[in-house]
């Protein structure tokens, strides 16, 4: 019998050509590849427990009704992790976890009044004290979508009116005028890991304290390009982050937010897909961590007050290579986000299949078990201070977070390489590196999301009958 099985050629993987908005069907690639349903169910449960309840968990409950997700190595809770936790909870029907995370987010992170009403402070200490006031736009993106799904799954009469909460955020993120605070960047404190988001003023005003503050506008979506901002106010509204682009989320808003903006959200989805074409390299499919709205690289990006180059021996030193144009931590999410849009909508299927295979071809050239976690867009490795540090280390690694998202891209691919990436991901262990570095938070969440994708458990949640 075994000899007969070995003689049968392996079935080629064939990406689906229609999205779940149309079919209401979800592909289980792991079962297609030969893993049993029982093995797949056990794996998803195991990885979920690792993130939420295991010895290296990042989810912590507070009292009888709240909880938070922490970037443990940076000792904070971020809108990224809180909204990811809510999305995971609604996907896996964990209502208690969802409600705890939302209550904590609303109490400590969300601005209830003032110029930032409805937005969320991107980082808080685990006691709820804010590290910064400003928002990072991807948090709002996930909060809104997760709340709409919660409304669709559980209704709005179990203690939290999820739809009303989503609609409030959607109303607050529309362009509004405000007068920035004097004294520099309101949310731009020197906080470990990022340096702060959401300044009260742009760089020009920060360098001229005598100038009276000019009225500015705050918005999650840039009105001119219809693309998501890096931050809704200050310096960050002048550019975007490719990893914040999840076009299918806008389609969820268009279908079920009931905010009177359906046509606008569909247009945002269209513009977001067009942007992704522009921001990736045509040979490697790599993108930069941040870029201009036209997809071009950041030019001279720096934090205000920090010099571009230094004088040495009387001669100006060339400015350092701009690491924000490199593929690194934020960028890991892009292949998985494009996978999500492919699975749910498939409105840009031909390009997305090209992207998936081009991206995996590049990673394959670097070694399935050895590819590094940061690259320049041309595929060369960054050097020195151009390497973005994490957890006290400035080092290139083979990180399981990128292993996860590279494997997730197999949902768009038909070449045999994709099987190798999935098998490598299945076998990969989430454990400390030899030098002690370990990221339970970001690596752990991306690992869980990827297994949800590959098992068909990351789904559109329509209103329940």
Which residue stretches match the model-derived regions?
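Inward-facing hydrophobic residues that define packing positions of alpha-helical scaffold repeats
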Residues: 102, 147, 163, 170, ...
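Hydrophobic/aromatic side-chain positions at a characteristic register within alpha-helices
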Residues: 90-93, 148, 410-414
């Amino acid at each position: 019998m075994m000899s007969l099985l070995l003689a049968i050629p392996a079935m080629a993987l064939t990406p689906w050509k229609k999205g779940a908005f149309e079919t209401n069907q979800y592909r289980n690639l792991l079962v297609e590849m030969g893993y049993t349903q029982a093995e797949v169910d056990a794996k998803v449960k195991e990885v979920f427990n690792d993130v939420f309840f295991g010895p290296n968990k990042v989810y912590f409950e507070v009292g009888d009704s709240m909880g938070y997700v922490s970037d443990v190595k940076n000792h904070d809770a971020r809108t990224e992790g809180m909204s990811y936790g809510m999305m995971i909870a609604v996907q896996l029907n964990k209502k208690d976890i969802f409600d705890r995370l939302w209550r904590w987010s609303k109490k400590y992170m969300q601005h209830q009044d003032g110029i930032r009403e409805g937005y969320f402070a991107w980082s808080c200490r685990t006691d709820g004290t804010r590290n910064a006031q400003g928002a990072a736009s991807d948090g709002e993106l996930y909060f809104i979508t997760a709340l709409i799904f919660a409304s669709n799954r559980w209704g709005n009469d179990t203690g939290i009116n999820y739809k009303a909460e989503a609609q409030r955020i959607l109303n607050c993120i529309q362009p509004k005028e405000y007068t920035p605070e004097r004294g520099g960047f309101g949310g731009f404190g020197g906080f470990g890991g990022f340096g702060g988001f959401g300044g009260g003023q742009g760089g020009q005003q920060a360098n001229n304290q005598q100038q009276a503050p000019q009225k500015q506008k705050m918005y999650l979506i840039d009105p001119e390009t219809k693309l998501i901002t890096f931050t809704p106010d200050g310096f960050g509204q002048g550019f975007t982050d490719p990893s914040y682009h999840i076009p299918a989320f806008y389609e969820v808003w268009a279908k079920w937010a009931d905010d009177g903006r359906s046509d606008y959200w569909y247009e945002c989805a269209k513009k977001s897909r067009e942007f992704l074409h522009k921001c990736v390299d045509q040979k490697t499919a790599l993108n930069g961590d941040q870029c201009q709205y036209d997809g071009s690289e950041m030019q001279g990006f720096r934090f205000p007050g920090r010099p571009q180059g230094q004088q040495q021996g009387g001669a100006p030193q060339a400015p350092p290579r701009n690491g924000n144009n490199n593929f690194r931590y934020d960028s890991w999410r892009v292949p998985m986000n494009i996978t999500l849009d492919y699975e749910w909508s498939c409105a840009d299927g031909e390009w997305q299949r090209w992207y998936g295979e081009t991206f995996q071809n590049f990673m394959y050239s670097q070694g399935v078990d050895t590819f590094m976690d940061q690259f320049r867009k041309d595929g060369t490795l960054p050097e020195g201070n151009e390497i973005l540090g994490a957890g006290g280390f400035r080092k290139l690694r083979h990180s399981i977070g990128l292993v996860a998202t590279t494997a997730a891209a197999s949902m768009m691919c038909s070449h045999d390489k994709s099987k190798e990436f999935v098998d490598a991901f299945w076998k990969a262990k989430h454990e400390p590196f030899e030098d002690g570095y370990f990221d339970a938070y970001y690596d752990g969440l991306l690992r869980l999301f990827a297994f949800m994708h590959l098992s068909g458990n990351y789904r559109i949640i329509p209103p329940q009958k």
